Amino acid sequence: MQWTAASCDQHDQHDPPAVNRNSIEQRTPANNCEVDPMDATGSTKHPHLPKQREADRPVSGSGGGSSSLTLSGAVTTSMEVTVSTTTTTTIIESSSSTNTTLEKNSPSPAGGSCSSGSGSLSPAYLQHHLQHHGSPLHHLQVHHHTAPPSPLAAVRSAQMGSSVANGAGPAAACLAVCCSPGSSHHHLGHVGHLATGHPLPHQLPHQLPHPSLYPLMAAAQLGYAGSSGPSSLVNSPALGRRKRYTSNSSNCSSQFNNNYAGLDVDSLDDMLRKLTELEQRVIEAEERAEEAEDKVRAMEQRLSEWPKPPPQQAQHPHSHSHPHQPIPSHPQEQQAKNHCSPSHQASGGATAGAAGSGLPPTQETEKTITSLEIQVEEQRQLRLHDARQIEAKAAKIKEWVNNKLRDLEEQNQLLREQNVKCNQQLELLKNHIANQSQRHSIVGPVRNSLSLDVQDFTGSGSNPEHRRRSESLDPQEIIGRPLTSSYPHHQHRRNLSMEPQELERNLVAAVDGLTLAPLSSISNKAPGGVPTESGVVTRPDSSDTDTAHDYAEIYTPSCEKLPAWMKNNPALMASGGNSSTTTTTTSELGVPRPPTPPLHRFPSWEAKIYQVANDGLAGAGTGTSTAESTASQEPDIQDGMGTNLSNGRRHGHGHGSGTGIGTGDGHGTLGSTPGTPLPPSRQQQTASGGFCDISVPVYATVKGRASQIRSMPFTGDSSDDSSDGEDHAVMLTHHSHNSSSTDNTETSTSGSASSPSKSLKTSSSLSPAKRSGSESPKNAKARVHIQSRTSTTPSSRINQHLQPSQHQHHTLSNQNHGHQLGAYTVTPSSGQLSLPRYHANALQPGSLPSPLQHMRGTVISDLSFESGLSDDYALPPDAVSESTCMDASMPSLLMRQSYVDSPSKKIESLEKMGHLAKLGGKLKTWRKRWFVLKNGSLNYWKSQHDVQRKPQGQIQLDEVCRINRAEGASTFEIDTGKKVYYLTADSHATMDDWIRVLQNVQRRNATKLLLSRDDQKPTVQGWVTKVKNGHPKKCWCVLLGKMFLYFKAPAETNPLGQINMRDARVEEVEHVSDSDSEEREDAAQDQARLTVAIYPAHQGPTYLILSGKPERDNWLYHLTVVSGGGPSAGTQYEQLVQKLMETDGDPNCVLWRHPILLHTKDTITAPLSSMHTETMQPEAIKLFKSIQLFMSVAVNQPGIDYHVVLAQNALQHALDMPELQTEMICILIKQTSRHLGQKLSVGVQVNKKLGKQTRQLLLCATQSLFTCDTQQAGHAQANGSSPTSIQAPSATPIIDCKSNPPVYSFVQGWQLLALAVSLFVPRSSRLLWYLKLHLSRNADTKTETGKYAAYCERALERTLKNGGRETKPSRMEVLSILLKNPYHHSLPHAIPVHMMNSTYQVVSFDGSTTIEEFQATLAHELGTRDATNGFCLFSDDPIEKDLEHYLEPLAKLCDVISKWETALREKGSGKFENSRVIQLSYKNRLYWKHTIKCETDKERLLLCYQTNSQIVQGRFPLSRELALELASLMSQIDMGDYSLEKSRDVGVGLKGLDKFYPYRYRDALGAEQLKDVQELLVSKWMLLKGRSTLDCVRIYLTCCRKWPYFGACLFQAKPRQSPESNTASGATPVAWLAVAEDALNVLELSTMAPVARYPYSSVMTFGGCQDDFMLVVSHDDGGGGEQKLLFAMSKPKILEITLLIADYMNALGHTVPGTPQMNSLTRNGSHRSLRTSQRPNLGGGSAVATGFSTNATTTAHNTLNSHATHTLNSNHSHTLSSSHHAGGGSQPGTLSSGHHQHHHIQQHHQPDILKSTPDHQRIK
């Protein structure tokens, strides 16, 4: 925005001054030529530049007409008037600078005063201006006045000069100018505008100075002379510059005004105001800087002219300055002012005196002048330096401001475009509403989805910006809520990170109150392919293409909002019947166009393959791949108006003879082909339940994260419904059905009888179901109670079908309130009744209109009204807003006082009340309830006001009740045995309070029950004085089992307290207690009393004061028996271990030779460790015998299975009974401890220097202490050993004692110990210490047993790190330990892992290796990414051939193998099948679109083979031609170039067809056709000769990724429907459930066309429900409510799809390393992992952190759909750009591993696992 006058002197070109960074005005960086204003002395006024030399200044009159002036918008220094100047320009301008009065006491001849800046105007001038020039017409005439210069200008100049000289002032001169004929003084006003920095719209042409500005120049000169003195009029060096300045100003203003009248001033007001403010700040800053410069320059000039001082300079230069001087802008200026002013004044006074007396200057004066000159020179240099710095800063600021203004201008332009588009949309919307309101006929049936592929038709069709995606908007959304504007980039509204809120509010306000009817169905398409409706959407050849675009953005219905897709989709109905349904085809459901062609050129052969992929993939292009034969085989579907819409399916051209998807060449649909078997029956599911009991968990969504709320499916019984008879007015008509209603003859036995309580394995976080949106339920759309729980009459159940075409308006009268409900509609896609927002609180069932009686099979979702007093639906804990209720921020506010007023004694609170959210209802939604805990029971009401009524439910807290809390969520569960209540608090603090009080009540209730039982007799009881913390109290004390209880009285059932004696220590003390004032009731107690002290583990001591010795002895004896503390506690074996601990494991201690600690051949008579029950003692003795039997018989190679079974049974016995685990470790330690003997001497000699205590210790030992020969260490004292030590001299050789068994017995004992320490460790810390000490004492690399001991040390550390095991060791594990010493290998076991390309990799592991660790090792050896590639491990099923099981990351691999072997034996033939072992495979499970560029070559190769497996099995929609192209690529990848040797093999082509061609195409071919296809495959294969494997892999994946659902894991499922909604045939067809990374999609079985889509953000609950898969979704589009969907699937598939959805949801909130950040839905750390003490996190694994492979089920073996491909579907509009990856950067040879290894591994050719453990396989 520049404008230029005639020309400008080059000496005046300077950079603009610095401006504020916050300014937003725009300036032009180039050619900033500005004129600097002059001060009284003619110096430049630029604050940031050095003073201009006198020689460089222009002389008077030098500013001719050739000077040019350029203004750059913001900085207009040249148009300003500084403090000491007054021009006509600034007199007229009235808004920019401050009002400053100059020279109040001016001695000018004019005698008047004038104002600087623009603050004060002459009233006479203003009146004259308004009277004569007020009309806009005059403005227009003056602005265009371009008269040439007139001779009258000189006359006016003379008149104005005389008027100023006579004292009239500049205002009179201005009036003279205004009144002169032909003058255009309005230029002056606009010059004032320019002085404020107002920008001009565009560059103006060059013009001569206007004649009216010549007198203005003269007036400016006269005004300046009047203010500065008469001499300055003639001699001022600034006169010429001031003329040029004034002329340039007038010229610029003339150009501006000639073009300014044509602009819209209102549109620029905003920008002008901002620029004015910025200019004001600039002017103020410059004024301050110029004030300081003026003083310095004036001083400098006076000093330079000192020898010839004029008479005028005797006056002080500062006499006329403004009284209020601004502070200089720099410290140097202030310093110069302060430093120079006094000296200057002194020298000035002396000079004046000398001049008056006529004497010459003295020497002192010369010195003063010299010093002043030096100081002035220093100040000049400082100013120069500062000017350079300021100039550099100003340049940077200028550049930043320019860039900022440029960006803002671009944003403004974009907003203007959006505004235009929104206005067009609004007009279109109004027109459409007007057209709809004019129609009074019945609207046709609403289409479930409408796809509008509209282009701009401007020749840039390939540009993705011009391609409109198939947006979707449900008619329910249009009806039920105000419309919002579409984002101009045509993205789906769920993908928007920010919406233009202001535009949205404008659009809502514009259409507020308007009701929009649903769209009419479109019966046919226009010739151009664009659907037409009522003339609103035009054809492509129409000129109004923008209208079509806007209409497509607003009125595209959604397949995403189709909760009743199974009712409205004809492809999923067995027969159409009389129901009015519409068709949903591939093209109509928004299948996008092919991706944009790449920027680089492909080779012709590669481009041809991509073209085939575009045409041959169903859904990859515009839908042309669906063959006509497919459409011809399907029945014609009639819509509601009777129009045949089946021709909409015949919109493509075929390739070859019938390239339809799933046609099978006339042999039925895809579901009947051999490649896609239907789901097995329920009996087959039972038989193929896998090698573990399958229990499908249930998940709820909280903050975008899937949290497990149940470890087993919902059974539909009252036991898993925690509603307790609450109002069930909201029900789904098809929900509460039994599996017998559809499959009467089917049974299910697997996984349905397990306990409802969750085990430690699956105790993941419990969370409430997420409600979409953050608005309060009271602000949600009002719902109507349509159906009550008790009423079952047809009038109360809305199960009739309302015709979708009948969008009728009915009035529902509310009998209670007497007003009417507005118009309602029933959307056919969801079947939900839509009502106006605030109309009624209830709706009588009998008042429903007749059309609702025709709703058949329609899901009536949550339609209940929210009354003002009822807070039925609670806010989820994550949606608590700032207006949270008080109990959320103060969790203990309503809690009863927990402590009594006593300062020392605390009483636990047993009562509490407050709000909790409870999971209840058939939809399992969270409802807010008022809970009150009192008298040992938990009651709840609907609200706090209902406390006086009967409670809705009651929870008894007895001994069976279990209270479990969740990790990471404020949710806990109360399991009463019959029901499980899921409760959610508002915060973690509130939850902790509730759990603490509930546990206190439960503990108290359990004590009551314990005392009331007849079989629980107290061991001892009586009155005892208890002293605690110095406070005595007489209590009734009872010793019950190991619990010491004390009560107020014998009849009390609530104890005052309790002490667990298990870890307490009991001692007798001599009447010493910490009591300060013991109670004495009578004189008899004055005698000495006896005291027993109890020292609990983590508490202070408690003293019991007893009156007599017999009573004291009785209590002391019984308390000591039940206590667990002290050296004498426990068995004799444990006491010896305790004594060894006291000696710190001294190897010379005599206790090591105690026979109880050493091996024995006899059977023990009592357990070695403490048993809590007597029933476990016989089990311990049996365990000892089995171990003794294992060790006594030598291992024989032919009969090795004898030892395998013995070891497995003993270890399983210990796993089943945890108390036996410590016992087994003790037995193995004892049986592997040798008796040591010497050659010499018999008997025992004790050193004479032994002390008394040592002799007593030896004498107190058992008589059999020394049963083996020993010898005294006579040199013990001389060798520096302890005098109490008894040791054998090291020089004497040690031989085996006679009590030792054969050597093999010890070896086998160590082998069994090596197996045991990998399964469990002792629970007692004392015995764990002893085990570690035993291993370290026996570890020796030179002996066989020493090597086993060294391995046991490593295995023990691994078990302590990763936790224990679940099942017995497998046969493979036992054989690996028995047949070779594990010491030689850090990982003693190994197993092959099979890849999809028929290769395998042998990986080593140990007994504690988890699947996660094993997979990390495998990925390292294969060269793939670790944990981020989505690949997981799967195992085959021992029974079913095609069933595979997903292995959880935290499961132990040895447990997996053991369970597999157990299932093979138990569910198979029952015999040992030693020839079969488990087969592990490595496949992709989770596919991420954003990690494509991070894939390694090995991953892409494996993904190619996995995708090919899906294609061959018919799980990929492609044409015959594309199938041949992909088969040829796979042949090149798998077998290399087609050479002459291969051509001799006739079956090589047939082999390629068998491996890479779809079954459904190959099986229907005859012999001749098969030969032709084989030749065609060979010919395409030959064309790929010389192509590298990397190129073929890249092309193959690029072609396959063009399918929008590439990567979606496919599951076949049968939708469940209510009996009323079943079709005439009573059957519902099977569909595909495609699980992608962002949504669950429903596809047709035959065509794989999309039917419905449920994003994870709308999923509330999912998992098992009886024998079906349940999915509960919410509708946040204004339809309100939730919907429950059921799908019949096999149990393994239900488990797999549940875990897969949970893993995808939990991974959305994480960032994959090395990949871009996804939309974060959850907080950091969201992962479906185990958080139990038995399963600590592994330090080396990263899968737990990234969330790709997670654990969420009860069992360690989860099933997987063995035919599923795991890829991605991330865009809502199903567009997928083609990705091409260069093969560079990878290591050569990584893809060729499949060619150098064995390709075909049959089951009977499995590698020998026991021999495949080379030493080079290790952990790196």
From Swiss-Prot:
Stretches assigned to the MyTH4 domain: 1159-1378
GO biological process, alphabetically ordered: animal organ morphogenesis; neuron differentiation
Biased amino acid composition, Polar residues: 20-31, 453-463, 787-818, 1714-1724
PH domain mapped to chain residues: 909-1003, 1017-1124
Keywords for the protein's UniProt record, in alphabetical order: Coiled coil, Phosphoprotein, Repeat
UniProt superkingdom: Eukaryota
Residues recorded with modification Phosphoserine: 542-543, 1073, 1075, 1077
Residue ranges that the Swiss-Prot or TrEMBL entry lists as coiled coil: 265-308, 362-438
Keyword Repressor recorded: no
Sequence ranges of Basic and acidic residues compositional bias: 294-305, 1805-1820
Cellular component per GO, a single term: cell periphery
Compositionally biased spans, kind Gly residues: 655-669
Annotated Low complexity bias: 86-128, 247-259, 346-358, 623-632, 738-769, 1764-1781
Biased composition (Basic residues): 129-146
SUPFAM superfamilies documented for this protein: PH domain-like (SSF50729), Second domain of FERM (SSF47031), Ubiquitin-like (SSF54236)
Region (Disordered): 1-73, 86-158, 226-260, 286-366, 453-497, 519-548, 577-597, 619-689, 735-830, 1713-1748, 1764-1820
InterPro entries per record: Band_41_domain, FERM/acyl-CoA-bd_prot_sf, FERM_2, FERM_central, FERM_domain, MyTH4_dom, MyTH4_dom_sf, PH-like_dom_sf
Domain FERM: 1389-1712
Protein name: Uncharacterized protein CG43867
Organism: Drosophila melanogaster
